[in-house]
């Protein structure tokens, strides 16, 4: 891990999106001020990292700076984080989960490549995550329930934001179909491909019923 940590010293911000949930809030807030209005929510997100870990230190540093300034911050990953480089293959994704824990992610969405080490391996990995995996449309057909929590609601100074996870219905073909089947080739899991839009809309409606003032869809699609 020492060599890994040395690699992480290269600073680069993977991505940052600022979402204002109150009227008249500028798109980008000035983070140099020592005081904060607390009226913005910073959603820091990463996507398709594919084990390219060099940007994580800057993301962690930026997140820490915002929190120190009293800002509301949520950090999310939109999928395909744990596969793509030797660090992922050699640890079957566990090293990336450890790094994401250190960064301080709140939520993550399973991308199609999260399943490349097998479904069971990924499900075991999620148990070691300090953040929550979300997916509204990844369903266990044996129970009829979603494998992960469909959405999560966070309260920011009295305003509530819901984060909905969306997996690509193409995960079957972009990963390994047999991982989602029994020994007879019957599918045990679904990505709600036949009811995709209805499933997502129903989840949005449920989040609204739970008091969400804003709904943010975090999807790994395409």
Per-range role (PLM):
Residues 12-13, 24-26, 159, 209:
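Short, intrinsically disordered, low-complexity terminal segments
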Residues 12-13, 21, 63, 70:
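Generic low-complexity, intrinsically disordered sequence content enriched
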Residues 1, 25-30:
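Intrinsically disordered, low-complexity Ser/Thr/Pro-rich tracts
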Residues 30-222:
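Acidic, metal/ion-coordinating pockets
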Residues 12, 16, 20, 54-56, ...:
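Short coil-to-helix leader/linker segments, especially the first N-terminal amphipathic alpha-helix
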Residues 9, 18-27:
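C-terminal segment of classical bacterial N-terminal signal peptides
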């Amino acid at each position: 891990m020492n060599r890994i940590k040395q690699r992480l010293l290269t600073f680069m911000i993977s991505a940052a999106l600022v979402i204002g949930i109150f009227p008249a809030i500028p798109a980008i807030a000035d983070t140099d001020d020592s005081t904060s209005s607390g009226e913005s929510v910073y959603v820091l997100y990463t996507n398709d990292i594919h084990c390219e870990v060099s940007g994580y230190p800057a993301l962690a540093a930026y997140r820490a700076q915002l929190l120190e300034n009293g800002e509301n911050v949520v950090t999310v990953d939109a999928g395909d984080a744990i596969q793509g480089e030797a660090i992922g293959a050699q640890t079957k994704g566990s090293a990336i989960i450890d790094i994401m824990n250190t960064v301080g992610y709140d939520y993550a969405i399973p991308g199609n490549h999260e399943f490349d080490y097998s479904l069971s391996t990924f499900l075991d990995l999620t148990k070691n995550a300090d953040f929550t995996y979300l997916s509204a449309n990844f369903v266990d057909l044996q129970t009829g329930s979603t494998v992960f929590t469909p959405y999560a609601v966070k309260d920011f100074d009295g305003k509530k934001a819901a984060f909905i996870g969306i997996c690509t219905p193409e995960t079957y073909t972009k990963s390994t179909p047999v991982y989602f089947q029994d020994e007879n080739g019957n599918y045990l899991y679904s990505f709600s491909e036949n009811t995709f839009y209805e499933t997502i809309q129903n989840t949005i409606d449920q989040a609204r019923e739970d008091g969400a003032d804003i709904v943010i869809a975090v999807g790994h699609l395409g």
